[in-house]
Amino acid sequence: MAMSERVAVVGGGVIGCAVARELAPEYDVAVYEKGQIAGEATALAAGEVTMLSSYEDYPDIGWHAVEFFREYDGTGNFTFTELPSIGFVSPDQEAEKREYAEQFSADGLPISYLDSETASERYPTFDFSDHAGVIEHGVSGFLDPYTFAITLQNDARADGATFHTDTPVHDLLVEDDEVVGLETDDGRVDADHVVCAAGWRTREFLLDHTPVPVRPYRTQCIVLEPEEPLSDGFPMGWYPGEHVYFRPEHNGDFLIGGWSFAENEPEHASNDADEAFRQHVADLVPTFLEGFERAGYVDDWAGVDGATPDTRPILDAPSDAPDGLVVATGFNGRGIMTAPVAATAVRSLLTDDEAPFPMEPFAIDRFDTRSDDFEFISISASE
């Protein structure tokens, strides 16, 4: 590989920033973003890191992310706060979830099944009376998404990467079935490789070259102030049957998110949480947490991300695509936590070096069709 090979990255969200940081020491990297860095889905993310529960079937993927966040903690203003996470188990799921915990704990993952009595002793703020117990994941955590992305950008810049904001990219330039650059608002940009990390917009951008099965969906977050600040031992978690996940804030507030649905008009989607979601949260939270009967409202927001048919991203150089193109999209709300994995995967695809984890879960040929007409699966409803 020539040290001067040029890589153009389409998209300045957390994935684009992570890719730029990974490649900048060896490549001439330029990132093109139509707005501001980390200005859309990244800034609106909840910042949860639950990679081991998301990839229990491929633990090397989960551990790669966890180890990165542990090592990156303290870089610039970035911090990674580790907390356990719990998933509520309904009575009809008890046998299945006990078996799940036994299987993966035997494989060395920090996963346990706690019956409702044990869970109540460990997490006394919760009311588990309607549940058989919880699945406890011992390794998870959270971070501030915007700070993370900007720290990645700063590292990339220090290694020579350039970032071009307010610069829409209009077309992928291809000659003789090879990528040669991009057409942007500022004119033509020559490149030896292009990494498309444009979120839900990736499908339309690449449709003439390689269709990708990605569709937009909208997700929401609300922050509440409980009657007393949450304690240091308060966990992250999710309530699958109610389509929500939650975590504490550093100041003792409570963030709850989810209520995700496919979005047919992403450019016009509201940035505010729906009234239906606000009411759902108001009704639901006091049923499983103490101290929220008179909780105060702090903030809410909503954002649009890209989904794939199986909820896992596409990190691949598709065989039917022009040579030199790498696709990194469809993170289903897990872009923040998957960013270190995505960056390593993209580097592997460019250099042909073997990745330190399986790449099969991210290959585009795992799908039978490239259509975007598929049923959206909400990860907040299924975890």
Q: Where does each model-flagged region fall?
A:
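Glycine-rich FAD pyrophosphate-binding loop
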Residues: A24-A43
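Dinucleotide-binding Rossmann-like beta1-alpha1 core, especially the glycine-rich loop
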Residues: A46-R122, H243-Y245
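C-terminal catalytic lobe of FAD-dependent flavoproteins
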Residues: L289-E383
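Helix-loop-beta segment of a Rossmann-like dinucleotide-binding subdomain
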Residues: T79-G87, D107, Y113-S116, S120-T151, ...
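Active-site substrate-recognition segment that forms the wall
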Residues: R21-L23, E48-V49, F78-F80, R188-V189, ...
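Helical element adjacent to the flavin cofactor pocket in flavoenzyme catalytic cores
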Residues: V134-D192
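Beta1/beta-strand and adjacent pyrophosphate-binding region of the FAD-binding site
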Residues: A2-I15, A30
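Short hydrophobic core segments
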Residues: A8-V10, L182, R188-R201, A343
